């Protein structure tokens, strides 16, 4: 099985850019404190990097 990464949304999306909101939805995150487990690929890492001020990598 491929490596996975867990991402948690730690800040709300109000006042953020529309593209950043779309990126958070693309990561599978809905509300604050929601956690999503994703495949550890360069594309996912880039999305996490783009919204790093909103999310936290759990593992």
From Swiss-Prot:
Domain of life from the UniProt record: Bacteria
Record's GO cellular component terms: cytosolic large ribosomal subunit
GO BP terms, alphabetized: translation
CDD domains (alphabetical): Ribosomal_L30
Entry's Gene Ontology molecular function annotations: structural constituent of ribosome
Pfam families for the chain: Ribosomal_L30
Keywords: Ribonucleoprotein, Ribosomal protein
Family: Belongs to the universal ribosomal protein uL30 family.
Binding partners and assembly: Part of the 50S ribosomal subunit.
Protein name: Large ribosomal subunit protein uL30
Organism: Herminiimonas arsenicoxydans
């Amino acid at each position: 099985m491929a490596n996975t990464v867990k991402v948690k949304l730690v800040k709300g999306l109000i006042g953020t850019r529309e593209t950043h909101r779309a990126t958070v939805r693309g990561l599978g995150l809905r509300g604050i404190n929601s956690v999503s487990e994703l495949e550890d690929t360069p594309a996912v890492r880039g999305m996490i990097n783009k919204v790093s001020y909103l999310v936290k990598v759990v593992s």
